[in-house]
């Protein structure tokens, strides 16, 4: 029996290059860099003093003061994009069965700022534990889908996925599977992250994961460039309304794309480094193509994980060449992170949205900040450097990989 088909009928975005879905697309096509000096805290003594922050975000535009105190930023971001996606899908204008609507949400870390501030307050005291009663519920990753379901009365499957930078891609994959199996008709899937904190920046600096290009933050995220020196930390959220195809047709919903294939694998190699030959990445892309019943020649665009790290970019390009063989030279490749920075657990959702917008607008967003060719990367690959490229896109493959060796891959197609 063929599984139930799953389509995307609504989207929402809150990113360092745009605070709404249309603004995000404008930022992508304009080749906007979201990086700049950190304003969230005094980073003057930090090894890295810049990040990709959301600009102009005021929580009081979305929440009451009481809610702002009770919700960590990552949960606020989740509610903001869920609202945009639900409105975009016109769920409020349709008669739907809320028992068949679920929320599955990815976050690699969750309420990091809440955890950090509570522990700092305790350490500065006399040893008496005086913790905020909302400390635990503000911090846990699953509070984001919980709050979304509470706000909208969705009674279907509700949980968080935690797989580092692959978290929201896993949320989309789980959402698709719940619809395929008939547990749900609609899943609000996505991810959010707010890691630009003292602890977040210090922790990633201690790993030597971040770029330290403090003299030129705008160009610091430079995937596939010879002189890349680490990723740029970002923050934000993305939401997608996943819906069973016949259900969407029956309510005359706008359909952006179909999710045709999914893949999962593990490197089983190292805590943070990818396998140097990209073995896990090779496996996950092959699994995804098999699930979609597509050939490599059917793919028009690959949205790379492309973090701007020395090891990661080389391993991923090796894997893509191994999977796609000669077909790799007929498609476009890009890295959204060159503009948004690395949104960690929100990356998969935001980059999935980027793929869908690229298909709907027949335009490939660029990989910005390329200055010098890396001799370890095939110069014949079309990495969409510097400028967007007009292209008819019928199928887009999106890679998302996480610390721990978690690999997730999703193929979006036009109907």
Indicate residue ranges for each PLM-predicted region.
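Active-site-proximal alpha-helical scaffold in enzymes
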Residues: 78-91, 149-152, 158-193, 232-253, ...
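ACP-dependent fatty acid/polyketide chain-elongation machinery
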Residues: 1-67, 246-258, 353-368, 413-415
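Short, well-ordered amphipathic alpha-helical segments that serve as non-catalytic structural scaffolds
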Residues: 78-89, 144, 171, 244, ...
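Conserved small-residue
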Residues: 10, 28, 82, 103, ...
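Conserved beta-ketoacyl condensing-enzyme motif
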Residues: 8, 25, 32-163, 192-201, ...
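Glycine-/small-residue-rich "gating" segment that lines the acyl/pantetheine channel
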Residues: 125-132, 173, 177, 193-250, ...
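Acyl-CoA/ACP chain-elongation machinery
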Residues: 183-229, 262-276, 306-313, 330-381
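Condensing-enzyme catalytic core mediating Claisen C-C bond formation in acyl metabolism
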Residues: 5-9, 36, 215-292, 300-301
């Amino acid at each position: 029996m063929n599984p139930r088909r799953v389509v995307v009928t609504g989207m929402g975005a809150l990113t360092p290059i745009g605070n709404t879905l249309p603004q995000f697309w404008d930022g992508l096509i304009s080749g906007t860099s979201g990086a700049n000096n950190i304003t969230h805290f005094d980073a003057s003594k930090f090894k890295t003093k810049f990040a990709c922050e959301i600009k102009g975000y005021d929580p009081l535009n979305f929440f009451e003061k009481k809610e702002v105190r009770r919700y960590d930023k990552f949960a606020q971001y989740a509610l903001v994009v869920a609202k945009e996606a639900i409105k975009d899908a016109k769920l409020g204008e349709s008669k739907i069965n809320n028992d068949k609507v679920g929320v599955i949400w990815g976050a690699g870390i969750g309420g990091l700022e809440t955890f950090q501030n509570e522990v700092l307050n305790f350490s500065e005291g006399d040893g008496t534990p005086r913790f905020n009663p909302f400390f635990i519920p503000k911090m846990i990753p699953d509070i984001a889908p919980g709050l979304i379901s509470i706000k909208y009365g969705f009674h279907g499957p509700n949980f968080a996925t935690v797989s580092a930078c692959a978290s929201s891609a896993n949320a989309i994959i789980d959402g698709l599977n719940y619809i395929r199996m008939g547990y749900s008709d609609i899943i609000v899937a996505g991810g959010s992250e707010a890691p630009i904190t003292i602890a977040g920046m210090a922790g990633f600096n201690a790993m030597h994961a971040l770029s330290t290009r403090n003299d030129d933050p705008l160009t610091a995220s430079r995937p596939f460039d010879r002189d890349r020196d680490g990723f740029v930390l970002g923050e934000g959220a993305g939401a997608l309304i996943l819906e069973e195809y016949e259900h969407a047709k029956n309510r005359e919903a706008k359909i952006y794309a179909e999710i045709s294939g999914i893949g999962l694998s593990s490197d089983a190699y190292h805590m943070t480094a990818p396998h140097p030959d990209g073995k896990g990445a090779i496996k996950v892309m092959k699994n995804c193509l098999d699930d979609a019943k597509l050939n490599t020649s059917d793919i028009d665009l690959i949205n790379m994980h492309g973090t701007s790290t020395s090891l990661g970019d080389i391993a991923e390009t090796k894997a893509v060449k191994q999977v796609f063989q000669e077909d790799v030279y007929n498609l476009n490749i890009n890295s959204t992170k060159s503009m948004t920075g690395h949104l960690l657990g929100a990356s998969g959702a935001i980059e999935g949205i980027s793929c869908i917008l690229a298909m709907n607008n027949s335009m490939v967003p660029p990989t910005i900040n390329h200055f010098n060719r890396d001799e370890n990367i095939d110069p014949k690959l079309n990495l969409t450097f510097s400028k967007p490229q007009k292209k008819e896109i019928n199928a887009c493959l999106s890679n998302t990989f996480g610390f721990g060796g978690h690999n997730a891959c999703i193929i979006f197609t036009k109907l």
